[in-house]
Amino acid sequence: MARTVNCVYLKKESEGLGFQLYPGELGKRIFDNVSKEAWALWQSKQTMLINEKKLNMMNVDDRKFLEEQMMNFLFEGKEVEIEGYVPQKDDE
């Protein structure tokens, strides 16, 4: 049976992650409070951020920026802002 969590992002009970994907205390917080669906949404935003802002994951400042964006997105409900990005309309 799948593990469920009360997802802070989706604000509902949902299937949890299979294992802790992020290290440390923040990783435990994500594992305990973020659903698989919300994590997938974050991953797509993360990919867009890395590509559009040309972030280098070997750079400590870039990793810190990405972690801040992740916490804002998952726990504070703040949308990731990517310059020039226009979401596709449902009728397209």
Curated annotation (Swiss-Prot):
Pfam families: Iron_traffic. Keywords: Iron. GO terms for biological process: cellular response to oxidative stress. GO terms for molecular function: iron ion binding. GO terms for cellular component: cytosol. NCBIfam families: PRK05408.1. Belongs to the Fe(2+)-trafficking protein family. Could be a mediator in iron transactions between iron acquisition and iron-requiring processes, such as synthesis and/or repair of Fe-S clusters in biosynthetic enzymes. This is Probable Fe(2+)-trafficking protein. It comes from Shewanella sediminis (strain HAW-EB3).
